[in-house]
Amino acid sequence: MKNVLILGGPGNISESTIRYFLEKKVPVGVLTHATTDLLGLDGKISVFRGDRNDIEDLMRVYREFDPEVIIDFCCFEPFQAKVVVEAVKQMHCARYIFVSTVDVYGYPLSRLPMRESDPWGEPNCLYAKNKKECEQIFKEGFADTSTSLTIARPAYSMGKTFALSAFERNRGKHIVARIREGKPVYVPGDGNALLQTGSAYNTGLMIARIAENDNCRDQDYTCGHDRLNTQDEYIKAFANVLGMPVKIVHIPTDFMYSLERKEVEDSILKDLSIHNIYFSVEKFKQEFPDFVWEYSMEDAARAFIEHQDKIGTFDKPLEEQFEDKVLEKWEKAMEALRQEIDF
């Protein structure tokens, strides 16, 4: 296999993709605008500074690096897809891997576990809507060209730089901080909703295997963990890694919506957290029966905590979030109610 060009990164998922190809002695180039952390890959990859939204930058990198395969980890908006299609048509690249998202299937899912071929619902957030439109732009743009398209749709992939809370996509660090401080952690509903937490390390390897296998041309694959967990188990994974107890407080989602607060409306509760999240990876397993999901959910939580400690995320107390303030008032109200119920 000749050169592999990564658009974006090195990041949460793409790091293990890059390391996989480096171990196989495949040259890897990365087009990035980042000027700092390369996650320990300094000197091991060809780094091209530039803007993936600029067709001239894309063409410059193509001429210098001559990739056989391009893996796009950072296409989030339709205009970005259009720029890439125009550039790749001039490049004549053999394969293009678009990293989309399982959110394009729409929630609630039409089937559990959700397969690639099952009926899709409408996207319920702008992120998913844009990714779905990008998929269509790539499909139409690469039709009848020499470039074959493969779509990889990662499920939730926790890793060094990314962990969800039930309320926001970037608040995993607040879960860690609250457990360390002995504070309760909010979980919606009764905590038994399915989440299917995966490791970014595993997901990155799945994408690498797809990118090197010609059988995957013109296909789409869900990339996620092969096991399930509940939302309560997700929080407990952080506590287990920290070696500390955690108090989980369940608050009904209907109550959260009844507050009619912008913070709730803008949260991921409606988009994600109140639904059962369960995707089939059987299509991937049929193509790669030897694949091993090496990292567990706790391994992923450990990678997140260790990296965030390393970069100083927890050096200063984290600001209390909206859901934490609601949780505190909920606890007081529930205690008052317990005292009222005396019969």
Q: What is the meaning of each model-derived region?
A:
Residues 4-24:
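N-terminal Rossmann NAD(P)H-binding glycine-rich loop of SDR-like oxidoreductase domains
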Residues 35-93, 98, 106, 111-113:
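NAD(P)H-binding glycine-rich loop region in Rossmannoid oxidoreductase-like domains
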Residues 209-269, 303, 314-343:
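Mid/C-terminal beta-alpha module of Rossmann-like enzyme folds, strongest
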Residues 187-193, 221-228, 239, 272-273, ...:
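Glycine-rich Rossmann NAD(P)(H)-binding loop
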Residues 101-126, 140-145, 167:
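Active-site "gating" loop of Rossmann-like NAD(P)-dependent oxidoreductase/epimerase domains
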Residues 137-164:
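Conserved beta-loop-beta element that borders a ligand/cofactor-binding pocket
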Residues 200, 258-291, 310-314:
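Conserved C-terminal active-site "lid" loop/helix of NAD(P)H-dependent oxidoreductases
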Residues 167-175, 188-211, 218-219:
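Substrate-positioning beta->alpha
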